[in-house]
Every structure is written in C-alpha cells, then in structure tokens.
C-alpha cells in the first residue's frame, strides 16, 4: 500500500467518526477529473470553504489522484534521494553549502558545488558518521569543515582575528565531534581529523596509505608546500621543499640532504658536563692569538661602516647596551656580534685546558667576520682583504697542534655568512678565507652555512636576550606564553626592488591589503633601528613573516622564536638546511613553510593561508617553541650558570666534542 493511500484511509476513518452524517466534498479539477468514490456526494460549498479540514481533504484527494499515475517513478526517486543523502556530506563553508559525494570506490570527496575536485583524502575505514547525521553544524559558525585554499582540506576556524570567542567543539550528529585538541600534522589548515569515539586515534597524513587503495597513491607523500619522502635504507622520513629543475640541482640537493643528516649524527642530546669526570677527554684549548686577529678589530668600531658607530654594540661583552625597559638580560645586540660573544664564553668553559697536549678541541679566536665587515664599504683591493686570512693560516701552520691532525680538531667561529668568506676572482665582496685549502678540514661555525660543505655548521644568530640563570629563562617562558597576541601576522623588513627573485614586495602588498590581520614595520625609513620596536611587534604577533633578504637566513627568525612568534619560512635554506644542532628536523613543530615560488607566481595568498590556522594549532606550536626550543636558541651571559637548561653555546660545545670524537 502506498504512503498516500494509507494516509488517505486514515483521514477518511477519522472524519467518519467525527461527522458520521456528513459526506466529504471533492473539488473537481478543470484539467483532469479524478476518479471519485460512489459514496461521495456534493455538499454545501459554504461549509466546504469554512471547514479547514474539508479543504485539506480536497487538496489531499487531488494529490492522491495525481500521484497514482506517478506512484512508481516517485517511489524510485524517493529511494534514490535516500541513497544520495546516505552517501553524501553537506559541508558548510561561510555562506556556501557544498554537497560532497563519497563512496567505497572513491577515496576522495567530490564536492558537487565546489566546481573542482579538491583531493580530500578521507580515511574511510577509520571513522564513519551515521548517514542521517552527516550535516556538519557549528555553534556560531566557528569551527567547520571547509575546503581550504589551493586544495587544502579539513577543519578550520571561520574567524577574523579581532572578534569573538573560540568554541571548544562543534557537534556532528550524536557520536561525531570535532575537537580542537585533535591535530593531524600541523602544517595546513585542514590537517585535522574528527574522532568518532574515545578509542579512535587520529591518523597522521603520511600513514593514510595503510587504509587507502595502494595502487592509486603516489610513492611519496605530497603536502601542499613540500614532499615527505622516505629513506629506503633507514625508513626515516625526509622533507623535500622543492623539485630540482636540472641534474646539477638534483646533485646539489642530494649533497645538502646528505650533509644535513651527517651533521645531525654529531648533535649531543644530553648534558653531562656537570657529572663527575664529564670533562675527561674533552679538553678545549683556546689559542692566545696576536691582538690584530681579534681585539684590535673591535677598536675600529667607529669606522667599521660609514653610517653607524659600532662601539655601543661591543659593550657588555659584545651584548650591546642594556635595554632597561625589557628587564634583566635584555640588550641591543647586533647580528654580527657572535665572534666576541662566543670568545668571552669559551674562556670560562669548565673543560678549558691550558696545556695543548691535554686538549681534544682547539678554538681559534680569529674575528674573521669583523675583518670582512671593516672592508665591506671601502675601496680596497682583494689583496688587502686577504691579509689577515693569509696570516692566520700561516700562524697556525707553525703550530704542532695544527699539523698533528691537519686542523681537523680545530674550530673557527665566524659571525657572518659563509659566502662572505668565499670570494671568487670575479667578485670584490668579502675575503677568500674559506676558499683556502688549509681551511677545508677545520670546523667552521657560522650564522649561515654553505649547504655543500659538511664542515660548515650553522649556529643561531645572537638575539636580544642573554639570561644568566635557569630562573631568568623560566620567568621569560611564563611571561611570553601569557602574553596576549593582538595581531595575527607581522612583517618587519624592507622591499628588495632590485632583486627580481625577492618576494618581499608581494608580501608587503598582501600585508597592507589586510590591515586587520597583518602589521608591517618598514625598515627602509628606520622603523627597525630601535630594537624595542621590533620586539614589541613580534611579541604581539602570532606569525612573523621571514622571507629571504640579502641572503636566505635572518636574525629575525631567532628574534621571533624567543618572543613566541611562529616564523613563516619561504626558503628551506633560511632554516631547515641550516641549523641542524638547534632546530628539529620536523619543521612543522615550530614554523609554517610556504614555497616562495608559489608566492612569486601568486598561487597562494599568505594572509589567507595563515588565517586558516586554528587557535589550537597556534598554541601547540608556541608551547613547543617556548618550552623546547627557546633555551637552546639564546646565548647566555658570559658568567651564566645553567643547571636545568642548555643554551645555544652549551649545545654547540657539547656537539663539537661529539663531532671531534667521531671524526678525528
């Protein structure tokens, strides 16, 4: 019996009980006369109009008669709609409702109203919502499943940075909830999964292959901005941030990755300096060089660069002037002050020895960066620039300690980028110190390394913070985690109009186009000259844009990290291929990577991409930065006494000892 016939019978039965002596009239259509019962009689038309139940019955009779002819097609259509609904997901994104179809044959959701297939890989074997409860709703439309930009996927917040409170969860039917605690990989706005019940666990994206059709998947995991590859020998994951365009580029990229992995094997994970006998076999000898190689260079501070007096930067053991407004341990430190800072600290190292025969590591306190800097803007010949580099190599060559291992157990700390010491004939910039054959074996610690030199090791730029005790670090950690962030994004820098490869102008335009989300501090007009201005900007921001400048690396990356601002990296050579001892291999834990080529070709809007990051993602990253990374990114006071933490200097020295033990 059809649904309409059954309902008609119930209505007739009910009417006959209430009005046994009245017959229900039936309206006659002008186009088609429905078949009527023999018992039906014509009643009073006025009563027909006055009685609403009678009108309803008239309309129902028409529907019943017409549906009789279409009973079979309507039944089929009704069943098809049920099937369609049970295999679809309604996705609410802003003011748009997307209907997305999934099936056991398709591992992707195909959104009929999206206009394209956004490649949303769904782990269908791991969680399934009831068919009738697939409509995603959210309180105040805060936390919804959206189609992200450029094919992103997943759960994101429809938030502007200035408004409203974040809801803790969005309900999806009775059993399915979207918890903000559940993160997927932390890289894109969509890498979040819903948990059907308490026992279910989120699946990391790189492991989704185990629940999907193996034949339909690529060999390597492809995220929007980088590729997760696997080492066939070790099974460990590797990150590819761009695809080599030529065979030479591929060779260079493989060398970079190989040297990065080698350097990570030298990283010392523990702190055993304070254990009894911890300096056994770890003596460090500091050469007492003629003053022309270090102290005399600092005395030229007033004439080092034409437009600035560097003398103030060399106060307080080269930390610079104290920033009283910031409190204890904060100084106006220059980015090129690493050499004297490291020298002051190593002179007080607990494993320092004064007898060369007791040493395993030899430190050469040559301020090569200061030597390069003083000639940068002076019209002198290359021979003049190479005077001290040639003399230091000659001086070392006279030492038995150098000749014993051909310099393999020696270390230089150079406070500029590697390329400033690798001048070739056609250029006039810098010195040729690191191009000398004698300099191949020693370890070179620099603020930016040559990725194709395994003995070039990058260590952090000096920041503004130089704590003296564990308490100083702990107080700052608590303070920065509790600091409200009034801006979503910030950028402190200047455009590079003469560099066609620079993306800075594009980022500045995007930032200025979204003043509610992004703040721009223009360094061209002196806005960055005052350290406090940069600190205030980063301390108030969730994300800090870090595009390459004159070279890939930036002091600003480390300034942002110690201020709790998540760095946005556009070039892997800015950080990921540099600081193997101080930054973890998994960049997603502390940064956001956006390929600079995508920015240059305007395939991505950086502001929109960062707006898609959830509050929980931001908080998790900041917590990791502040608790796990921050202590190891700062150079402590020259008299620092750390028991609980290791600062950047401690990590560097411990790892140097391990490197020498493995390679000499």
Swiss-Prot record:
Compositionally biased residues, Basic residues: 1-21
EC number, UniProt record: 2.4.1.-
InterPro entries linked: Exostosin, Exostosin_GT47
Location(s), subcellular: Golgi apparatus membrane
Knockout mutant characteristics: Lacks acidic xyloglucan and has short root hairs.
Lumenal-side segments: 93-664
Enzyme class: transferase
Summary of the tissues where the protein is detected: Root hair specific. Expressed in roots and young leaves.
SS bond partners: none
Name of this chain's protein: Xyloglucan-specific galacturonosyltransferase 1
């Amino acid at each position: 019996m059809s649904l309409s016939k059954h309902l008609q019978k119930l209505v007739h039965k009910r009417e006959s009980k209430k009005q046994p002596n009245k017959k229900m009239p039936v309206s006659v259509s002008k186009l088609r006369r429905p078949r009527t019962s023999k018992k039906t009689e014509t009643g009073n038309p006025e009563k027909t109009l006055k009685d609403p139940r009678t009108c309803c019955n008239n309309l129902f009779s028409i529907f019943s008669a017409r549906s009789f002819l279409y009973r079979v097609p309507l039944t089929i259509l009704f069943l098809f709609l049920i099937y369609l609904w049970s295999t679809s997901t309604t996705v609410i994104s802003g003011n748009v409702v997307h209907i997305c179809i999934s099936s056991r044959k398709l591992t992707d959701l195909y959104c009929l109203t999206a206009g394209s297939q956004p490649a949303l890989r769904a782990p269908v074997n791991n969680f399934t919502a009831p068919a009738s409860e697939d409509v995603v709703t959210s309180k105040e439309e805060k936390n919804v499943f959206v189609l992200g930009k450029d094919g992103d996927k997943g759960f994101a917040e429809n938030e502007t940075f200035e408004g409203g409170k974040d809801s803790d969860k969005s309900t999806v039917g009775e059993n399915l909830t979207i918890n903000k605690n559940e993160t997927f990989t932390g890289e894109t706005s969509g890498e979040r999964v819903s948990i059907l019940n308490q026992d279910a666990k989120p699946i990391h994206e790189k492991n989704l292959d185990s629940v999907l059709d193996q034949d339909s998947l690529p060999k390597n995991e492809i995220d929007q901005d980088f590729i997760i590859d696997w080492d066939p020998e070790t099974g460990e994951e590797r990150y590819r941030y761009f695809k080599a365009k030529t065979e030479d580029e591929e060779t260079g990229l493989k060398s970079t990755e190989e040297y990065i992995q080698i350097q990570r094997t030298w990283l010392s994970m523990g702190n055993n300096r304070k254990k009894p006998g911890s300096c056994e076999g770890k003596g460090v000898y500091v050469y007492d060089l003629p003053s022309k190689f270090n102290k005399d260079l600092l005395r030229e501070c007033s004439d080092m660069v034409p437009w600035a007096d560097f003398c103030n930067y060399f106060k307080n053991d080269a930390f610079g002037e104290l920033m009283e407004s910031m409190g204890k341990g904060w100084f106006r430190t220059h980015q090129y002050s690493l050499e004297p800072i490291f020298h002051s600290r190593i002179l007080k190292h607990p494993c320092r020895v004064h007898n060369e025969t007791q040493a395993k590591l030899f430190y050469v306190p040559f301020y090569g960066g200061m030597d390069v800097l003083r000639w940068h803007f002076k019209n002198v010949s290359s021979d003049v620039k190479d005077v001290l580099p040639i003399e230091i190599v000659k001086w070392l060559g006279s030492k038995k300690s150098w000749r014993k291992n051909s310099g393999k157990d020696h270390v230089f700390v150079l406070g500029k980028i590697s390329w400033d010491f690798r001048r070739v004939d056609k250029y006039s910039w810098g010195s040729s110190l690191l191009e000398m054959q004698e300099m191949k074996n020693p370890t070179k610690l620099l603020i930016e390394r040559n990725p194709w030199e395994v003995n070039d090791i990058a260590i952090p730029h000096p920041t503004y913070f130089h704590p003296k005790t564990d308490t100083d670090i702990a107080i700052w950690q608590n303070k920065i985690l509790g600091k409200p962030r009034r801006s979503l994004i910030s950028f402190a820098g200047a455009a590079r109009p003469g560099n066609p490869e620079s993306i800075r102008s594009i980022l500045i335009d995007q930032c200025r186009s979204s003043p509610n989300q992004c703040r721009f501090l223009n360094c061209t007009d002196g806005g960055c000259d005052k350290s406090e201005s940069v600190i205030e900007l980063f301390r108030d921001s969730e994300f800090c844009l870090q595009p390459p400048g004159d070279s890939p690396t930036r002091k600003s990356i480390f300034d942002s990290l110690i201020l709790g601002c998540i760095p946005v990296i556009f070039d892997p050579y800015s950080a990921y291929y540099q600081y193997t001892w101080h930054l973890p291999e998994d960049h997603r834990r502390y940064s956001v990577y956006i390929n600079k080529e995508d920015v240059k070709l305007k395939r991505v809007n950086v502001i929109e991409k960062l707006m898609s990051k959830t509050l929980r993602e931001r908080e998790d990253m900041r917590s990791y930065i502040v608790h796990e990374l921050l202590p190891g990114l700062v150079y402590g006071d020259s008299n620092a006494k750390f028991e609980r933490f290791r600062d950047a200097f401690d990590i560097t020295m411990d790892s140097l000892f391990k490197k020498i033990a493995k390679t000499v």
